[in-house]
Amino acid sequence: MDLQITCTEIIKPSSPTPQHQSTYKLSIIDQLTPNVYFSIILLYSNAGESTAKTSDHLKKSLSNTLTHYYPLAGQLKYDQLIVDCNDQGVPFIEAHVANDMRQLLKIPNIDVLEQLLPFKPHEGFDSDRSNLTLQVNYFGCGGMAIGLCFRHKVIDATTAAFFVKNWGVIARGAGEIKDLIIDHASLFPARDLSCLAKSVDEEFLKPESETKRFVFDGPTIASFQETFTSFERRPTRFEVVSAVILGALITATRESDDESNVPERLDTIISVNLRQRMNPPFPEHCMGNIISGGLVYWPLEKKVDYGCLAKEIHESIKKVDDQFARKFYGDAEFLNLPRLAGAEDVKKREFWVTSWCKTPLYEADFGWGNPKWAGNSMRLNQITVFFDSSDGEGVEAWVGLPRKDMARFEKDSGILAYTSPNPSIF
């Protein structure tokens, strides 16, 4: 890629953060969230006006948006479990790309996509780094890519998706933004976690992994859903896609080259958005890590059955409600989890499933229309992240596994039958 950085500027909130809002407390959920960055990349076929006008438009609207999302413009002080909302601002990087966007990004390549970001997310653990950094890439053909890196300790994917949507709302002058900051740290206060046997960051820092994109199109998902005849209800898009992914992982794990080290069980942690599950519900767009996890245990000796997997996934998510969250986090029941306490007596493999589907990434309209494509370029390990396809019907599954496992995973009969490996986005 022929990319040249042309400008770097610090964008600060348009209005100073009031003194009574100068400290943003982290919650126990923030503490338990891995200290990593995650990325979002938004592609636009045509950014409309001249580069100079577009740049000025984005900077001014970003400054106004940060007034509402002021912790993103602050500094994380993890030893104090706070964000100092000091309005230090966020780096805004501009780059010119000589290549044609459609040709360069026709087939998403993680090495190419990474260059559209301000830094590689898996290398961005420096505590002095900003909570948000972004890079706006202008292509010679008139297209544009906005790459953003968010600190996960401070926000979750739902917050990030609403951030880019609301940035667009402000850029277009299309409405007001309110009720973003809630005091979830009072409900789920931070705690001393020195007793934990396992760092929450460990499993995300292993470099020997490979990330690939598998796309389930809408008609294939709909047809597959109809085969679940034993269900009392139609399984959701998330449930059937997750079942295929986990089924392939179970098979790949069984076929390990090291038979002496094959796990007895696959433990899957499914990320669940708590906002609408609380009583009373939190605003759907409120800021923070307001997530929990459902658990699915699957013995490796058990035959893969998509119907059973989908039911297990459904039941695990159903258990995550207001009462669960208040006990698990508010009463610190998470400390009893064997995986954190170091009391495991079962050889197991852990895998994470998280979905960004139904978040408003495709509503990030800055005045020149919705993005052509919304995705990421994260190098993942033992996790899959789901995104809506651009038509809103399909699912893009980005899967990160150790290389040997990926070679077996992508040859699984379910993956071959129901997905297209990394198809064109144009």
UniProtKB/Swiss-Prot annotation:
It catalyses: isomeliandiol + acetyl-CoA = 21-O-acetyl-isomeliandiol + CoA. This is Limonoid 21-O-acetyltransferse. Pathway: Secondary metabolite biosynthesis; terpenoid biosynthesis. It is an enzyme of class 2 (transferase). GO terms for molecular function: acyltransferase activity; oxidoreductase activity. It comes from Citrus sinensis. Belongs to the plant acyltransferase family. Keywords: Acyltransferase, Transferase. The active site is at H152, D365. InterPro entries: CAT-like_dom_sf. PANTHER family: BAHD ACYLTRANSFERASE, F21J9.9. Expressed in maturing fruits and in juice vesicles. Its EC number is 2.1.1.-. Acetyltransferase involved in the biosynthesis of limonoids triterpene natural products such as limonin, a compound with insecticidal activity responsible for the bitter taste in citrus. Catalyzes the formation of 21-O-acetyl-isomeliandiol from isomeliandiol. Signal peptide: none annotated. Monomer.
